[in-house]
Amino acid sequence: MTNLRPTDCEEFINDIDGGAFAEQLSYAVSIVASAAMETQKVGVITVQLKFSKSKGAGHNNITVEHKLISNAPLPKGKCVEEHRDKTPMYVNTGGDVSLFAKHTEQLFEVKA
């Protein structure tokens, strides 16, 4: 694609699961980092994103399957949490991905 427009990563992460994914990731980072400091062991966070064409939807609609796995080390063992869900999204002209299509016009008058 010659006119590839990169996706706004911050907006994309915040759009996944209505913002719940971003909150879960923020929480996981704090928990795993704190546990790694306390135990002096390695903690791991894994984020997996799968993209597939949405069935029966418009031609630019996709489904983003998201999975967040956190492994926080404990003095004896580890604490594992896994969150997974799906979010319908839209591939805009140029390839950027967002929750809503960006080709629509402003519906309401913007007052400055």
Q: What is each of the regions a protein language model found here?
A:
Residues 1-12:
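N-terminal, Lys/Arg- and Ser/Thr-rich interaction peptides
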Residues 5, 72-74, 87:
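Intrinsic-disorder/low-complexity coil detector
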Residues 9, 20, 80-81, 100:
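Compositionally biased, non-globular sequence tracts
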Residues 10-13, 86-88:
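Generic secondary-structure boundary/loop-capping signal
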Residues 21, 25-36:
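Phosphate-interacting basic helix/loop segments used at nucleotide- and nucleic-acid interfaces
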Residues 37-79:
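Short, structured protein-protein interaction patches enriched in aromatics and acidic/basic residues
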Residues 83-112:
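Mixed-charge, glycine-accented linear interaction segment located at domain edges/termini
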